[in-house]
Amino acid sequence: MTPFLLFLTFFCAGPLTLQALGASPSTPLSEDRIQVRLRQMLDVPDSVRGSVSLDLKSVTLAAMMRSDSFRSLLSKIPMIPVDRLEQEVLTDATLFAQGKQEWNRNQPNSLFGTNRFDQTSMDVGVEKRLASGTKLTLGLSEFRNNSAFGSFGNVDSKVAGGRLNLSQSLWRDFFGSSTRKLLDSGKAKSEAKKIELESEIEDWFLQLSGLFHQVWMAQKRIEATRASLERKERLAGLFARRKSLGISEEAEQIQVESAVKQTRVQLEEMTRLLEKQWSLLVVSLKLGEEDRRTDPTLIPVHLETALSEPAKDCADPVDSNRDIRQLELELSALQLQSGVALDQARPELLLDLGISTNGSVLNAADEFQTRWLNTLTARFPAYTIGFGFRLPLDASIEKSRILSSLSMTRQLESQLSDLRARMISTLDTSCAELAMLGRHYRLYDGIERDMKKRIKLEETRYRQARSSPFSVLQAGDELYGTTLSLHTTLAEWWNRHWSLKKTKGLLFQELDAWVSEKTGKSIFSNASAGNMP
């Protein structure tokens, strides 16, 4: 037997397996076992009938529930309200309480002084600053005194007291203008952090979707390469019969042998690439060793081929883009803080108002009801009014804060203007490319159908000795290239589609809708409830 016939015997004896190609051994699983693993992997309920395949939505939801990378993102959720809470400290209520016991045996310094004075005092109340810049203090107190005045004897008294004090800024924090700016700046910063996290989740999804498309594309390359190898092996069989009749040349033999060998090498390389990308996807989904060692060519991976028109997404402005919104909120917070710095450089004019009342009982065992009734009904009131004025002569700290805020504001304004211009340009480019990819996909789909007809015609002509092996190989290679272009265009279309969604600020809403559809809650609600890692 000639070397060429040995070569044909090896390649035509049966279908080419991964083990024959030198691929790493993988766990042999039946189709039923693969379906069981997929259902476990994707948390598919038993009520869902039919076969299950990996699609981008199911992979994304599984990764959200399992992956360490997504868990790392969710760990930032508790940091979102920090800036808002730091500013709300200004309006937090404070409860205070204190008590004191005094035993005084000092020598009297006058004829009417006491030579013994014992006092027990207790004071409790609450302080709060309102958003109007008003500081309120409400307090209740109790004093019990026992005094000895020499020959005059002992005097016992019990005094209850109440007070309400109000302090209002009339200039620097004019009826809370500066306080509200601080509160609003904290809210803007927290909202900016939330949007920043949403943008990071979008970026995380784009990386995951890119990996998913690579796995799908690697499978399609292997399918196309196997089909190409089958065609070339079929051609080799036809060539062997013609050679036995003495109507083939050595150059044609070399050409056919080389084509089969090259395709075999391509198939091995693509198999290795698929195994590598499948391992990365398994890690992203935090699956087990059994899943990693499963033959990835047996996993059904689905990518939608019905392409939508991007006209609607391209018509809307980019103002909802999360990067733009984040910068706008950061700029708003900075402008509010600049206003606070200007306020702090102004003079301070304070108005203080107060009302106090008391109830006192002398030399009585315990008249609790009497003294507190007098206190709470303000039977014996006292009123105070006062003004205070402070003028900063240098205000060095305030000046430094104003200059710093002014510089940072100008930087953010420039960044925002540049980002908005770049996003508009990116939107126009993405829309044009997306429309082009959609047209190309439809063209490649038609070309592939035509090329399949052509390869059949070329093989028929070769059987009839009306064509050469080169023509058959060329037709097969052109079909192979067209098929790869078709699948590459589809994967690229989906990559651009999701990138366009991010540019428009619509991607996170879609991801949130996926999670809500599965769990009934949003991403952040699930994370807060502990339903996500």
Regions found by a protein language model. Give the residues of each.
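Regulatory alphaC helix of protein kinase catalytic domains
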Residues: 37-62
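Small/polar, glycine/serine/threonine/aspartate-rich low-complexity segments that form flexible
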Residues: 47-51, 99-168, 299-306, 338-339, ...
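Bacterial N-terminal signal peptides
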Residues: 3-15
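A short glycine-centered flexible hinge/capping loop motif at secondary-structure junctions
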Residues: 243-250, 462-466, 503, 507
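Sec/SRP-type N-terminal targeting helices
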Residues: 71-79, 88, 131-156, 171-196, ...
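Periplasmic alpha-helical coiled-coil/stalk elements that build and connect Gram-negative outer-membrane
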Residues: 194-318, 433, 437, 457, ...
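Acidic, low-complexity, intrinsically disordered peripheral segments
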Residues: 17-36, 40-46, 105, 279-297, ...
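Amphipathic alpha-helical coiled-coil scaffold segments and their short linker/junction regions
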Residues: 127, 187, 248, 252-253, ...
